[in-house]
Amino acid sequence: MRIGHGFDVHKFGENGSGPLIIGGVRIPYEKGLLAHSDGDVALHAATDALLGAAALGDIGKLFPDTDPAFKGADSRGLLREAYRCILAKGYKLGNLDITIIAQAPKMAPHIPQMRVNLAEDLQCHMDDINVKATTTEQLGFTGRGEGIACEAVVLLVNVEQG
């Protein structure tokens, strides 16, 4: 077994700055997150957790933001590619727990679809995926509505043992 932790944060752009995509779900909101890819903090944190657990570096190593090929990239595709690397190393997902930290918008209505997307991309049961959201009670940059942060913890199991 191996445990990995991931973290990601992006700041909001101006009003009308583009879609807000979290957990592979387009969430209605007046601002999008600024990023080289689609800015999906949940999938970026999950990808980092997976790569870290397998000692494969991080999302920036595998998908550098200096590479124009990843400009505007769909983070679900990045997650699937990272998971292929995990499988190739002889591991599979045990479980994934994600915490989205945002004052707004409310994530609760979108969490079921996020779980569906993650289970599909990681070839697992929805029971292996947990997504939750919290605020910082209006403290810090997330509390002021300047951006969204996310943490993820993953357990990988050896394919031969799992």
Curated annotation (Swiss-Prot):
Domain of life: Bacteria
Family: Belongs to the IspF family.
Organism lineage string: Bacteria, Pseudomonadati, Pseudomonadota, Gammaproteobacteria, Enterobacterales
Sites where the protein binds 4-CDP-2-C-methyl-D-erythritol 2-phosphate: 8-10, 36-37, 58-60, 63-67, 102-108, 134-137, 141, 144
CDD domains in the record: MECDP_synthase (cd00554)
This protein's pathway: Isoprenoid biosynthesis; isopentenyl diphosphate biosynthesis via DXP pathway; isopentenyl diphosphate from 1-deoxy-D-xylulose 5-phosphate: step 4/6
Enzyme Commission designation: 4.6.1.12
Catalyzed reactions per annotation: 4-CDP-2-C-methyl-D-erythritol 2-phosphate = 2-C-methyl-D-erythritol 2,4-cyclic diphosphate + CMP
Keyword annotations: Isoprene biosynthesis, Lyase, Metal-binding
Pfam families named in the record: YgbB
Primary enzyme class: lyase
Record protein name field: 2-C-methyl-D-erythritol 2,4-cyclodiphosphate synthase
NCBIfam families registered for this protein in UniProt: ispF (TIGR00151)
InterPro entries assigned: MECDP_synthase, MECDP_synthase_CS, MECDP_synthase_sf
Subunit: Homotrimer.
